[in-house]
Amino acid sequence: MKFHKSQLLTLLFVLQFSFSFAVDGTQIFSIANTLQSNMVIQQGKPLNVWGTAKSGSQVIVRVDWVSKIFQTKSDKDGKWSVDIPVPNAIPGEFNKKKIWISQGKQIKELSNILIGDVWLCSGQSNMAMEIKPWLPWLLGANSYRIEIENANYPEIRLFKVRADFKAMPEEDCGGTWVVCSPKTAPNFSALAYFFARQIFIKRKIPIGLVVSSVGGSSCQAWTSRETLANDSQLYKKYLFPYDTSRQSKEQIDSVVTFEKVVRPTIFYNAMIYPLRNLHFTGSLWYQGESNRYDSSIYTQLCAKMIYNWRNLFRDPQLPFYFVQVAPYNWFQNDDKAYEYA
């Protein structure tokens, strides 16, 4: 491929400009992706606003429910963090809030924010199943067309964590906060939506749903390496076989496979650890089928995962609600029926 002199000069100018822009560091001013317009923030607990900026930069955070201006400086790694007090939600009051984050001349504004209860919803396909039909075995909610048509609940918001696999804990994750409406409701987790709707109707406070789930995933995939390594039985059962396998030497990509979704730690690293600075009212867990052969150790595994999450979120009393996987065709004389739950 041949370039004219003018094209080469233009290319060199663009590269030089891009390099100087990167060295200046202004482009790295950012806030965590979980902090967005349309979000619900947890009532009665500090809101942690965090992100990155050029090392040593002053970052200013203002919110419209507190008169104080909050300031901090990014550390040597470019990380910064500020805690903002959050009041309790008032039932029936849905005043929308704003947050402004600035560094130098750069200002980021978050709007249409509500204060309420935020729930972390995780597990496998039982939790991931949307209100609308998706796959032959994920048929959606009963009367899903009527449910979607009536899903006009702007005080219910959803952040669906983008499914991903990581060998090491990630700083951030993908996803977008959306407001519940007939347009967006089809993509809501059915279980999370009906749970949120019932709580909202009873309590009249906004409900945020952070759904972090992947079909077919195992409990060990949602548990940290340290947690599995520090328990001799869990290490022997899950971590050691994986660490000595061919799969552990592969570079992990984002392609979903049945083999990959049961690997230890990968969803914790990509889809739980990035949420570490959020506060939650509690967690909903609907999983179990992919651990159906691990009945002798599953209780121990779940207990350690819960302990792991509570430590991560700095909340030793964080409520954790299980949905027991229901027996499937239990009345039939089929000793394999439990596999189809």
Regions found by a protein language model. Give the residues of each.
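Bacterial Sec-dependent N-terminal signal peptides
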Residues: M1-T26
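Cell-envelope and extracellular/periplasmic
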Residues: V23-A341
